[in-house]
Regions:
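Non-catalytic structural scaffold of enzyme domains
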Residues: 1-234
Length: 234
């Protein structure tokens, strides 16, 4: 059984990541089962925002506390189930450093790694993110594989807060104007909308009812990357 630590910005989206992997466990063969660990970085949205805009030394201290303990406990795979977190910290460099420091092959799977290949498939793409720091990081990742890609982006923490507070998807879609956002992005030529926050799959079924564009959820592609790591570890 492969140990996987799920990191995200708040307890809510961390639990969403844990739930996502545990649903995958129910359909996976016995030799592909995961032991999923819950590792929130902050206690709520406000603390998460402060963390994301803190200096790199402070971020690293938080990450070291989580990673060092889990690596000591046999974890080699880390699943960053948070777009804004993956854009606020250099996990690529950190993955290499932790592998060197520990002498182990550490794998960190992030949404941004998925986006670096996703950009090749589109000419114009809409992005809805939790905040504009995240939207910027997603745009950079998408364009790293396609410099001609045109990104129509939006960051809206109000959507995240409403999800954390437990509002119904239909109410959030109405109050946050997501149907209007879809029409705006479609008018700008977007071919699809990327759900650039791991909270947003909570809205997906209801959003599809009012959305004229296909919705992209990167979580399944992240899981496929995790399974590749599983296979490599034998």
């Amino acid at each position: 059984m492969l140990k996987v630590s799920v990191l995200a910005g708040t307890p809510v989206d961390t639990q969403m990541g844990v739930d996502f992997l545990e649903r995958k466990n129910r359909h996976a063969p016995e030799d592909r089962q995961l032991e999923v660990l819950y590792r929130p970085v902050a206690v709520d949205c406000d603390s998460q925002i402060r963390f994301q805009y803190s200096d790199n030394d402070e971020k690293r201290q938080v990450m070291d506390a989580i990673f060092d303990a889990d690596i000591e406990n046999g974890v080699r795979d880390f699943f960053i189930y948070c777009n804004s977190l993956s854009g606020a910290f250099d996990f690529d460099r950190y993955e290499m450093q932790k592998s060197i420091d520990s002498g182990e092959d550490i794998h960190i799977i992030t949404p941004l790694k998925i986006y670096r290949s996703l950009g090749r498939g589109y000419r114009r793409l809409g992005v809805i993110a939790a905040n504009n720091l995240s939207a910027h990081s997603i745009e950079e990742a998408l364009m790293s594989s396609n410099r001609d890609l045109y990104v129509i982006g939006s960051g809206n923490m109000a959507i995240v807060r409403a999800i954390e507070e437990g509002y119904e998807p239909s109410a959030i879609i109405e109050s946050c104007g997501l149907a209007d956002m879809d029409r705006y992005m479609e008018a700008c030529g977007a071919e699809a909308i990327l759900l650039g926050c791991t909270h947003f799959p909570y809205l997906k079924d209801e959003f599809e009812k009012v959305c004229g564009l296909p919705l992209i959820d990167p979580a399944d592609m992240m899981y496929e990357k995790l399974m590749e790591s599983f296979i490599l570890q034998g």
